[in-house]
Amino acid sequence: MIRKVFTCLTTVVLTFSMMAALLSAPGGFAAKAAEEMPGETPTVSTPEGDPTDPAPDTDAAEGAAEPAPDTDAADNAAYRQSTEGWSLAGSEQKAVLSPAALAVGDSVQFAVSIPADALYELRLLYRCTATQDAGLKLLIDGVSPFSEAQRLTFPAMWVNDGEAQKDSAGNESTPKQTLSDENAHGVARDYTGRQEDPYRFALTAGVHTITLTVEQGELWLEEAALVPPEQPGAYQAPQDSTGVKDYIIFEGEDAVLKNDRSLIPLSDSSNAAVHPSSPEITRLNYIGGSNWASPGSAITWNFHVETAGYYTIDFLFRQNELLGGVVFRHLLIDGQTPFEEAKRIKFGYKSGWQSLTFGGEDNPYRIYLEAGPHTLTLMATPGPMADVYADMQKVTAQMGDLYVDITMITGETVDIYRSYELFNQIPGFNDTLDQIIEQLSTIADNMEAMQEAESGSTVSTIRNAERVVRQMRDNPYSAHRYKTEFYDSYTNLSALMGTMTDMPLCIDQIILAGDAAEVPDTSPSFFDRVLFSVRRFLITFSSDYQTVSDSEEGQEALTLWIRWGRDQASVLNSLIQDDFVRETGIPVKVELVNATLIQAMLSGKGPDCMLQMTRTDPVNLAMRGALMDLSGFPGLEKTLARFSEGAEEPYRYDGGLYALPDTQNFFLMFMRTDIMKSMGLEQPETWEEFIHVAMLLQRSNLQVSLPYTRITDSGSANSGVGGMSLYPSLLAQSGLSLYYSDHSGCTIAEQLQAEVFGEWIGWYTKYKLPVITDFFNRFRIGSAPIGIANYTMYTQLKAAAPEIADRWVATQIPGTLRKDGVIDHSSAGSGTGCAITTLSKNPEN
């Protein structure tokens, strides 16, 4: 029993660390780093068959199709601009294809006959058969119309697997999310927030060949079609009343379909206004929150109309994350937008729960619904923020390029007493500053127009950046003195971009009321709120804040200790309860602890399992007999095969194995492709080439970044030597080890190891490479266009540096040329482990 949950927990934590989702190559101590991985979803090799073959012959009356303009446009923004004014009144062109299961590398090709020049959207009837969203590459007549078309996303659809589970105290846990087994219609759209409407493809009259290649995930493709863009008209108020007195109330947590696995029912036990509410136990009573913030994420509810007629829509919601701001949702009824106003429903800020009548309480929008089953979908949309986001991306890119130009002249540290003549040294410097000032002013004005509060932190950040740039322009002889403030403004704007298109929203209830219905008021009275607060206060005296999950009475539960934050622990507990506990019936008790394991075991109160143990802990505890030797468990070799070769070595002691890896870290090399290309530099394959690139960058006052961790406390030392610097990686690439084979000591004094050590130290002493740098910020602004960092930097750059999207790649670290002529790119690493204690009563299970 212990072994089963132990194996499951190891898998859960590895999933939690996102390694498998980020990199397919293994990484661990002396493991090979991943192959090149671009800043966006990478394209794979072209499938069998040449998609560039000419389109089939057509009748002479139809003629050959002329290519659409600007097919080489760099991105969709330029493509949209080049096709502005094209007709939207095309006719649906459904492909003739056989339904098929497609995996990575598979392609589908079909021809469509376009009667007249027009813009079309790509619509698929599909079903994802793997947990990963489907990523498709689109070619029109063998050419990708714009860069985003090489990575179109069609999300997997998720449903609740059964009802919410309850523990012995009545606390509800979220139901497991499983893939929907029904086909769904999806339109190719932008999920980054840079565009509100779906992608539109310009097709000239004639026959065109459409090729779809699977780049990511697996899917069942039932149907493909090119359809004219949806053009709902403005709302027209009906003249008559249907006199419908019915009303329908459905709960947010009862959603039947989601296109994001994280859109799960949630609990709010702090407010009496939510339905249902309870201060004593966990009740699932809403959906959304920060999980429902990404543009394009959608939730669907089913409802049934008994009487046909006009209905109004009310939302009981909470939007308490964007201070003074608004979020937007796109409403669809039965998959269609009822009218133009439904594309941008505005939800304002308030700390608590509030209600919104669609269209306003005085003149609510009335939507006609036939009797029978219907669906209601709310999709997160950036609304007018999409244009602001695009403008912000342009201005931050311009500021980043200008900062690199300034750094090339002044160096990283500015001499305030020196005149650098920036206005003369940098071509168009004054004009560039004017453009940045104008763009920032326009963005701030647009943001103020959208926000409900006149002054917010978002607008203040933009106004402050505008002020700094204006000071640089107005002081030509001392402009260099504002470099630090300019850098700070850039980083603040970049951080702002990371959340600019986030649209978090919580939905408690949705109410559809007939035009003559009287809906009862379900909001709590003053006395209800007071009673709820009193009950909530009293429960604090008996709450257990240490235990994240509990078990049924009479059942012996496995106790799991972790040292994470409560939010991370709750996520892990949800994974355990939804997967392991539900499948095996073995209860697991998750506890947050700060105590040391030895002290707990001496008192007889230790756990069965322990997660996130540092590199030194397993052997340290094994010496004292606190951990169980795992080498005797059946199936161990099969379990170890899931990890990188040698990942378990730090946990071996005296012939035994006392822990398994639960996280593994290794190094990647990150490059700013735009800067490297502008300077004529290529990706370095060896360390000699890397140093050569570093020298060329230093001539322009730019830098590289290398990983190094100063040992300031025992925690730093315990994290693992492989992740502190590149020295262990250099040893691995040279076929050397840091320790003797019998583990009797360190080999650093041996001649070969000392030579490698001297080479590593020489990077800092001979070539003056910086020891410690703020790589994330230096990389995003461009003053350190190449560097080596932990693989987690990939996630950080993807999530927090949207302004440089498509302008960087992550790839393997440089290598050492071996005697056989092969370049060894091995990377050392670090990680944490999980172990079973000797207090466990059922180790044989």
Spans of features found by a protein language model:
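Glycine-centered hinge/linker elements that transmit conformational signals in sensory
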Residues: 742-772
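Extracytoplasmic
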Residues: 34-53, 57-511
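Sec-dependent signal peptide cleavage junction
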Residues: 19-37
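Extracytoplasmic/periplasmic substrate-recognition and gating elements
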Residues: 116, 307, 801-845
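Short, well-ordered beta-strand elements
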Residues: 553-566, 580, 586-591, 609, ...
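Extracytoplasmic "Venus flytrap"/periplasmic binding protein-like
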Residues: 578-650, 673-685, 783-786, 793-809
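Hinge/lid segment of periplasmic solute-binding proteins
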Residues: 538-554, 615-668, 691-693, 752-756, ...
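Extracytoplasmic/periplasmic solute-binding protein
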Residues: 653-658, 662, 667, 691-746, ...
